[in-house]
């Protein structure tokens, strides 16, 4: 719950936006319920969801992006936490960047991402066009991943950031690191225009 409350306090899940999940095992995950304020979530606000089917046995409504969480758990067996946020930086950068990835390079904080050991690497963060058809969106993401493996997270154009990690701490570090890098990139672009 602490990570959810931290996200809420940062304003990264405004107006009940965003969602979070934890893997229980190979079959199940726990996903935040739709329409809940992420800054005040309790354990009762998480629904058990079957990873293969996206179904919640309770009958309650899981997040609209359930299919993206379960996709990540299927693509990355080592992923045990998924965080989806609607930050200003992620939302705006994903709209102004016209290519299919936001390329980050030269930032020391790239090393906050698992496996990154230098600021000299190019770190591409894939950008997918937003789609209300989550099944179709998940299929596009899966196809992209087969050709260009995803790492850490991806952006949905005009929507936000989805990231993951081997546990809550790693997912949170990826979220915080990427958000910092996005803020740096926003500032860099603004200053270059001035």
Curated annotation (Swiss-Prot):
GO terms for biological process: L-methionine salvage from methylthioadenosine; pentose catabolic process. It comes from the Bacteria. The keyword Glycosyltransferase does not apply. InterPro entries: Aldolase_class_II_sugar_metab, Aldolase_II/adducin_N, Aldolase_II/adducin_N_sf, MethylthioRu-1-P_deHdtase_MtnB. SMART domains: Aldolase_II. Its cofactor is Zn(2+). It holds the Pfam family Aldolase_II. Its EC number is 4.2.1.109. One of its GO terms (molecular function) is zinc ion binding. This is Methylthioribulose-1-phosphate dehydratase. It comes from Cronobacter sakazakii. The lineage of its organism: Bacteria, Pseudomonadati, Pseudomonadota, Gammaproteobacteria, Enterobacterales.
């Amino acid at each position: 719950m602490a990570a959810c409350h931290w996200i809420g306090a940062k304003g990264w899940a405004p107006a009940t936006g965003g969602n979070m999940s934890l893997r229980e095992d190979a079959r199940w995950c726990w996903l935040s319920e739709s329409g809940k304020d992420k800054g005040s979530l309790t354990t009762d606000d998480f629904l058990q969801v079957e990873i293969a089917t996206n179904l919640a046995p309770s009958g309650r409504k899981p997040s609209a992006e359930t299919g993206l969480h379960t996709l990540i758990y299927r693509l990355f067996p080592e992923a045990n936490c998924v965080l989806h946020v609607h930050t200003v930086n992620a939302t705006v950068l994903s709209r102004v960047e016209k290519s299919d990835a936001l390329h980050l390079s030269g930032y020391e904080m790239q090393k906050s991402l698992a496996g990154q050991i230098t600021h000299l690497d190019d770190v591409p963060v894939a950008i997918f066009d937003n789609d209300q058809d989550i099944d179709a969106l998940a299929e596009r993401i899966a196809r992209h991943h087969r050709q260009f493996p995803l790492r850490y997270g991806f952006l949905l154009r005009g929507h936000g950031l989805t990231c993951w990690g081997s546990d809550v701490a790693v997912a949170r570090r990826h979220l915080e690191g990427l958000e910092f890098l996005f803020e740096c990139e926003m500032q860099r672009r603004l200053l270059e225009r001035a």
